[in-house]
Amino acid sequence: MAEDRIEIRGLRLRCIIGFNPEERIHQQDVVIDMTFLTDLRPGGLTDDPADIFNYKTANKAVIRFVEASAFNTIEALAAGIARVCVVECGAPRVQVSVWKPGALRYTDTVGVTIERTAADFQ
């Protein structure tokens, strides 16, 4: 199978994230990057939307999930996003990065990157 990529960069959302008491009260900014690893040849050959991974649907599902979520860690949030992408939306494999701007003093952001397949959630 080809290792083609569909990339969504800089999805900016707000959610409850963090384990400090003040972080559990107000939503904070998170920035999400997603890379869907899939074979793009069928859609490239046919130019038919039915032959591509529907990244718009996946993006909407992730938005709904994140905005309704409340996690202590960005690691758990990233894993939840990956589950939505592969289990609910059918992505063969996904890389998810979650960034929390301003989380550490003197830095722009702190983040994690994970890679998952459906087998990781069975």
For each feature predicted by the language model, list its residue ranges.
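N-terminal, polar/charged subdomain of small-to-medium soluble alpha/beta proteins
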Residues: 1-122
